[in-house]
Structure formats: C-alpha cells, structure tokens
Amino acid sequence: HGRRRAPTIDETPLDQCLRPGVKLDFRALPDGYVATAADVEAELKRIGHALQPYDIVVVNTRAGEVFGKPEFIHSGCGMGREATLYLTERGVRVVGTDAWSWDAPFSHTAKRWAETRDPKIIWEGHRAGREIPYWQMEKLSNLASLPPDGFEICCFPVKIKGASAGWSRVVAIFDDG
C-alpha cells in the first residue's frame, strides 16, 4: 500500500527528450492563476493542435518576460493538477514552462492556502505526477519566439544518479526543408 518511488533524473527515457513540441500561450492569464483542463483544451483548439502521445508541451506564461528581476518568482500562471493530468492522460510525458515552477507561484498559492487551508493546492501540478509520472522543465527562455507547433524540442537531461532534478540545455529545432 506504499507509494511507488518517483523516477529519478537518471531514469529519464531519452526517447522522450527529442519529440515534437507544442506551445501553449498563457501569457494573458493573470499571475498566480491555476490553469485548468478547460484552459488547455481551449488553447489547443485555438492553435488547431491535436495532442499526440509524447508531444513535449511548453507553457508560455508572462514570467519569461521578467526573468532575472525580483518579481520573477511571483509571475506567471501555473499548471494545476487538472491541467497536468489532462496532458499526461493523453500521453504527454515531458512538459516545460518559462516560470519559476510548473505550479502557480508559491506566493499566490500561500495566499489561497491561508484562505482555504486546503493542502491539496500546494504543488498540485507537481503532485499530479504521482498519478501519471512525467518530467518537467522550468525557467525556459525564448518561448514567446516559438510558434504554437511545427518544431521539435531537444531536452536531454544531465545524468545525475538518484537525483530528483537536473540540468538540460533545451532547444527548439525547426525543419527548414
């Protein structure tokens, strides 16, 4: 009845790290907003993309615009449990964001927690990985320059035995042919 052990960064399946990319543009969502499955579905419809298993989905929040400034850790929306499961239930296994975290900025989550005292809202996007494991990348740059799709993402992680995280040089690859 115990929890299964979370996979570590050295166990990342490398075949999942060079895949077609999809960008969700959530820059218009307010700081601290928790994106839902409906938000993801609406954005996919807007850009005309049908998710495929192993697509790499990156989320463009407004946080990337203020990277390196004090407000960075308070900026951008986050991906909630429901939004994360929407992706992973459809076979997505690698995701990324330009924000400090996949989840809503913690300063906003702390305010919501003070009002509700609901522990389920803390790191809810991260914890969705307990149901369907996935890999996430944070603090990505230049997402605003990407189209919604039509590119591949390469994101091989540095292999650190037993680590819960690691570094990756993430690049978008376009076929000019």
Per-range role (PLM):
Residues 1-177:
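Active-/binding-site microenvironments in catalytic and ligand-binding cores
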